[in-house]
Amino acid sequence: MQLTPQEKDKLLIFTAALVAERRKNRGLKLNYPEAVAYISAAILEGARDGNTVSELMSYGTTLLTRDDVMEGIAEMVHEVQVEATFPDGTKLVTVHNPIR
């Protein structure tokens, strides 16, 4: 299978997000990479589903709360930026202060 660097990045995000989702479902608090991967994967999937950039920027703030992450992680994640593929092309989605 021949993958571009961008496709490899998306697969890595998806794999990390699966680990994060399983840990979250078991009641474990997510660390920094897990939290970012969890939010990033949701944004990528939302773009494929046809949501707009502004919808995804709002949606990204609803995915995790301070109770879902380890102490101090919410303060570390100031923004999450994901280059997502939309029906009309690739766009950068930025979610500011995603963990509230």
UniProtKB/Swiss-Prot annotation:
Top-rank EC class of the record's enzyme: hydrolase
> Which reaction(s) does the protein catalyse, per the Swiss-Prot or TrEMBL entry?
urea + 2 H2O + H(+) = hydrogencarbonate + 2 NH4(+)
**What is the residue range of the signal peptide feature?**
none
Q: What is its main location?
A: cytoplasm
GO CC terms of this entry: cytoplasm
| Protein family per UniProt | Belongs to the urease gamma subunit family.
What is the recorded name of this protein? Urease subunit gamma
